[in-house]
């Protein structure tokens, strides 16, 4: 074959290509194949036997493998050639910083899309700074062609300090929002004004737009009064036990309470002390709907007032006692379908529920009292409110509706700091989340169509659509954009233009904390990369992805290569903060979720038992007991590490701090700077788990290790309305909370203490307690994890009802449906059931203690010391 034959030409070009002293990226490989596509086609179509043709075909078929091998050899050689350069890179700044091999490989890798997975305490900022320095000094990249992006101003300042100040390299470091704003400025002839707080426009909508439009006001009030509280039917529970626990920790408060119209003076049946109730607390959101309807229509009622006729000593509390004229009516609401029962209950439980309904019906028939009934659902498709209205009108109760404008006025004036404000904040949160996903107006109609069978969601979406249109109109009129627009509008601008139509002179886009990226930021990054041919370097750790509530989507990190089309995944596994024992515990814990990227972090130091679970007695004086346990941990730290050791107190929520401050063992002398009265020289900082991310302290105390709605893991349920637009990680139970707990565990350089109540420990701790190198103090593994107080009759949680229609302080009642279990007690130790007094008929037999003998007995609440009351008493065996 002659020298100009296709095979020889391809071989020569390939040898020049593969022997270049550089890392070959996929784009460069693609360009090579595209430039030589005609040669490749000729070779494939004109096969003949020769050594050159076999060699050319081998190149065509295996060029990707050869490029990978070339890159590995190149990096291996560069590690040797650049060793002295890397060794000395930080010597003028900090002689203790020495880049490890994984960091150096990450710096030398020049793939188009690279993901650097940097474990906690592995020197992520150091790696990014070193990468920039290498690009500028070794690859002669102009600093103006490098864009470094992080998420917070604090993180931006840290990168600027390291790169701009220490290395004297003038690369641009920016937040995503500032980056988007700068892009918009390139195509704007006028100054761009940014709205920093959406509250002013949204509040204006309520105060001006809403109250002057009768139809809109009517629709708003209907939703607000009857549907703002989340119906339990809209929530998902893994078990019936979880459902009852949810009911236990939620207060269902009526509109009458919220408007200040509920104010009752009560005399405690047992102690005879007088107290005032200013809140009407119901059992369910459906009961709140009924109470609100009665209140709005001027129907007088009492909630759970004892039925006047005794039946074999059983206490019967009808849901509503209704008064109209001289007549008294009773209304029972049943939390099942009129015919179909409730799918939360099994067949036996539904049978017992029906039996309870029949019993109440017979009781009212026997005493000739009028009973009305409502159900959670009906076969005719009408809602609860429609059937309630029919029941009331059928029984001759006249409904006189309050004026809607008066209700709204009273609502906005009396609830500015509570319920009404909560709804405005909910609207702000919804619109922010809606826009952060890049949704436009048309998305409302799509969402309404998707959820057309959910009346509550549809009502809110229609309201939110009108609010969104008003909000966007006000932005436009005032020439404003909000923070979401900085990113959304810049993406919209870029996706409609071609290369060369905008000045985006970037060769590298380096993104810090990439695990926190949202879809709108991802889309913007891809468009900038498309228009500038910039390489994208994503740096982060999926184990620390904890900002889903702000729109972050961890799958954009874990599926980086798939979403980009290809890429290189690199790991930095040496951690310089934690001990090997601690990262083994934390790593095992977070990798219980198989969707997390597998990695084995390596530490330079060893410390036996770095995780200490500290139990405290939560039976009495919980606040002091918890604070005392924290103080004991500080004492141990001082004894082991001295009083110069820095201590971080981590809470799940900011209010965890106040549980400590209320104990009088601690005080706050500056924002989040805490002093212990017993150890005043110790430097103590308080941060939430989210705020602690990225920081390191000598020792850490996690002060909230409890189970519950505000525990760790947090069990706050999102409103289902938010869930339709929220990013949810359902890969594992409490997936994000598990990652957040990992963040909290890894803030320490030495030990982490976790404070937990002995009777209600976090489920995370019941898991950790069996791990190697986890120590438990002030308790034992045997008694660790006693559960909450349960009903002795049905085993569901007991709810404390300080204010109740029986006028018994500290009453505990079963959280189960009344039709299934009516257990009530006033003593959690003995758990004897309260019953109607058989002697006086209007008192109740409750647990009392003899002042002299200290023995317990059942005594009537109508007892009086002068013997003028009821003296009925029973011995407790």
Regions found by a protein language model. Give the residues of each.
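Conserved RecA-like helicase ATPase core segment
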Residues: 348, 356, 361-362, 522-613
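Helicase C-terminal subdomain and adjacent C-terminal extension
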Residues: 722-732, 739-743, 749-830, 873
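Short beta-strand-loop-alpha-helix junction that forms the active-site gateway
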Residues: 317-357, 454, 530, 542-544
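Conserved P-loop NTPase-based nucleic-acid remodeling module centered on helicase motor cores
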Residues: 8, 12-22, 27, 145, ...
């Amino acid at each position: 074959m002659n020298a100009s034959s296709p095979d020889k030409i391809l071989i020569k070009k390939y040898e020049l290509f593969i022997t270049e002293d550089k890392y070959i990226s996929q784009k460069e490989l693609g360009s090579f194949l595209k430039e030589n596509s005609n040669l490749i086609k000729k070779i494939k179509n004109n096969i003949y036997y020769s050594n050159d043709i076999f060699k050319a075909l081998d190149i065509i078929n295996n060029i990707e493998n050869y490029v990978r091998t070339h890159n590995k050899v190149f990096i291996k050689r560069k590690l040797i050639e650049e060793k002295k350069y890397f060794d000395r890179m930080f010597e003028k700044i900090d002689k203790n910083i020495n880049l490890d091999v994984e960091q150096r490989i990450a710096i030398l890798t020049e793939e188009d899309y690279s993901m650097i997975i940097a474990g906690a305490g592995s020197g992520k900022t150091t790696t990014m700074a070193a990468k920039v320095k290498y690009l500028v000094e070794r690859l002669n990249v102009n600093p103006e062609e490098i864009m470094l992006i992080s998420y917070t101003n604090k993180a931006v300042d840290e990168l600027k300090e390291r790169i701009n100040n220490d290395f004297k390299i003038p690369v641009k470091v920016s937040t995503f929002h500032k980056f988007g704003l700068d892009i918009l400025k390139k195509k704007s002839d006028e100054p761009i004004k940014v709205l920093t707080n959406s509250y002013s426009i949204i509040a204006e909508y309520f105060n001006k737009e809403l109250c002057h439009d009768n139809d809109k006001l009517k629709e708003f009030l209907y939703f607000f009064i009857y549907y703002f509280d989340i119906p339990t039917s809209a929530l998902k529970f893994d078990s019936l036990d979880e459902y009852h626990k949810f009911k236990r920790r939620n207060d269902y408060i009526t509109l009458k309470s919220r408007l200040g119209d509920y104010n009752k003076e009560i005399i405690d049946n047992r102690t005879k002390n007088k107290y005032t109730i200013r809140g009407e607390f119901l059992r369910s959101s459906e009961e709140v709907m009924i109470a609100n309807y009665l209140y709005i229509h001027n129907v007088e009622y009492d909630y759970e007032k004892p039925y006047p006729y005794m039946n074999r000593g059983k206490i019967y509390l009808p849901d509503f006692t209704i008064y109209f004229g001289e007549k008294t009516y009773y209304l029972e609401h049943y939390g099942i379908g009129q015919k179909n029962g409730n799918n939360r209950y099994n067949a036996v439980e539904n049978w017992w529920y029906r039996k309870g309904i029949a019993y109440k019906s017979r009781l009212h028939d026997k005493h000739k009292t009028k009973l009305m009934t409502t159900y959670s659902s009906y076969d005719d498709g009408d809602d609860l409110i429609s059937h309630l209205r029919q029941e009331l009108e059928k029984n001759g109760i006249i409904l006189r509706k309050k004026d809607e404008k008066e209700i709204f006025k009273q609502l906005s004036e009396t609830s500015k700091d509570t319920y009404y404000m909560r709804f405005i904040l909910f609207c702000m949160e919804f619109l922010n989340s809606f826009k952060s996903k890049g949704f436009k107006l048309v998305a409302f109609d799509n969402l309404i169509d998707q959820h057309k069978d959910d009346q509550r969601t549809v009502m809110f979406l229609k309201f939110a659509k009108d609010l969104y249109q008003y909000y966007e109109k006000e932005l436009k009129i005032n020439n404003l954009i909000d923070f979401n627009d900085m990113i959304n509008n810049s993406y919209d601008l870029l996706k409609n233009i071609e290369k060369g139509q905008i000045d985006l002179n970037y060769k590298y886009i380096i993104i810090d904390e990439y695990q926190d990226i949202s879809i709108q930021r991802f889309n913007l990054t891809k468009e900038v990369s498309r228009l500038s041919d910039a390489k994208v370097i994503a740096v982060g750790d999926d184990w620390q992805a904890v900002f889903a509530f702000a729109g972050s989507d961890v799958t954009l990190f874990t599926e980086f290569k798939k979403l980009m089309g290809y890429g290189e995944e690199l790991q930095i596994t040496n951690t310089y903060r934690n001990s090997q024992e601690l990262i083994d515990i934390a790593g095992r814990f977070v990798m219980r979720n198989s969707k997390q990227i597998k990695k084995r972090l390596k530490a330079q130091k060893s410390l036996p038992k770095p995780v200490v679970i500290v139990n405290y007695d939560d039976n009495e004086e919980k606040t002091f007991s918890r604070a005392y346990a924290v103080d004991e941990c500080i004492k141990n730290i001082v004894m082991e590490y001295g009083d110069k050791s820095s201590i971080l107190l981590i809470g799940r929520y900011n209010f965890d701090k106040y549980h400590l401050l209320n104990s009088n063992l601690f005080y706050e002398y500056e924002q989040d700077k805490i002093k212990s009265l017993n150890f005043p020289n110790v430097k103590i900082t308080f941060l939430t788990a989210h705020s602690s991310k990225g920081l390191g302290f000598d020792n850490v105390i996690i002060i909230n290790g409890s189970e519950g709605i505000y525990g760790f893991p947090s069990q706050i349920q999102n409103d289902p309305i938010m869930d339709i637009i929220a990013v949810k990680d359902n890969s594992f139970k409490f997936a994000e909370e598990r990652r957040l707990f990992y963040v909290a565990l890894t803030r320490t350089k030495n030990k982490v203490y976790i404070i937990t109540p002995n009777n209600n420990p976090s489920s995370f701790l019941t898991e950790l307690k069996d791990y190697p190198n986890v120590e438990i103090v002030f308790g034992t593994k045997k008694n660790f994890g006693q559960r909450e107080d349960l009903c002795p009759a049905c085993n569901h949680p007991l709810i404390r009802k300080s204010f109740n229609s029986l006028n018994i302080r500290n009453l505990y009642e079963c959280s189960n449906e009344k039709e299934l279990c009516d257990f009530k007690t006033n003593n959690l130790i003995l758990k004897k059931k309260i019953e109607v007094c058989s002697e006086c008929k209007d008192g109740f037999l409750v647990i009392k203690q003899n002042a002299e003998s200290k023995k317990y007995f059942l005594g009537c609440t109508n007892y009086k010391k002068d013997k003028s009351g009821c003296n009925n008493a029973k011995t407790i065996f």
